[in-house]
Amino acid sequence: MEEPKDKALDEVFDSALALHHEITEGTEDTASKALQDKVEEANTINIINIPITFILTIIVHKVKKAILMLEDATRLVSLLDIFSRNEHHKELPGEHLKYFLLPVLLGDLTTRLVESDRSEVVENAQVYYVDFLQRCTDYSIVELASVPTVTYVKEEGEEEKENVISGKPDLAKMNAERSGKMARFKETKQLKEDLRLLQESLAKGRDEEVVRQFHIKLIKKFVNSSLDEMASLKMEVEMLQHMAKMRAGKVMVEVNPKPARKLKPIVITADKMQKEVYGLGYPR
């Protein structure tokens, strides 16, 4: 019999995953009565901004709601000791594999926060993606040459040292990155087709092996998107630093220390000691 906490975790995660899909795939219920009435009202008084604002408000609300749900699910995963870094993914029940997605879903939703400081958003999103990629590597779901690291937005004076270093672009590295991106694109295309077929099989009945295959392929699809997102976020860090330098007029000035962060990534605690020191969910 399923334990109450297991059932609660399952329900919270599935609801959050459905909400994430709704947000990212644009499956907003535009046919809903409330939204239709709002659009008709706007068209009647010729104010086109009303439906746009209304839709954006709904999306922002859903993003924040999904983040809170996923953070709760992360705490429950830690509480239930579902993961240990000494395990292999084959040792886990098929139904537990989906919880690998917690940090990557949080990372994706974090990038969609529009009311927070962008530097905080970019840094915290990277923490989530790295946590996801590292766990997938630890459990041998994928083999990566190296797991990307978090690139932080540097203080005004910290970037000068790097700016002095200049030279020709690393063409070999650029070609390797381009080839990697193309390979991931092709693999993702195949994974989407495989997932579609597996989903059809699951609709006919819950077979343990099919469930396992579905979640493994879904995780691999998110691994590919995470690697692409990490590359994009690193570029955004460079852009944020460049913009900060432009605003400062390229003059070194003393800046006030950063205020305490409002965003704190909640990741899965792996062992008892971490829980005692940091709590059930803690920022890395």
Range-by-range predicted roles:
Residues 123-138:
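TPR/TPR-like (Sel1-like) alpha-helical repeat modules
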Residues 118-120:
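Extracellular glycan-interaction surfaces
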Residues 22, 29-41, 58, 140-284:
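Extended low-complexity, polyampholyte segments enriched in Ser/Thr/Pro and acidic residues
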Residues 16, 102-109, 179, 186, ...:
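Conserved small-residue packing positions in alpha-helical repeats and bundles
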Residues 91-113, 127:
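Elongated alpha-helical scaffolds
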Residues 15-23, 105-108, 169-170:
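Surface-exposed beta-strand-to-loop junctions
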Residues 21, 25-28, 75-82, 109-116, ...:
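Short amphipathic alpha-helices and their capping/turn residues within compact interaction modules
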Residues 2-46, 52-96:
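Internal amphipathic alpha-helical repeat/solenoid segments
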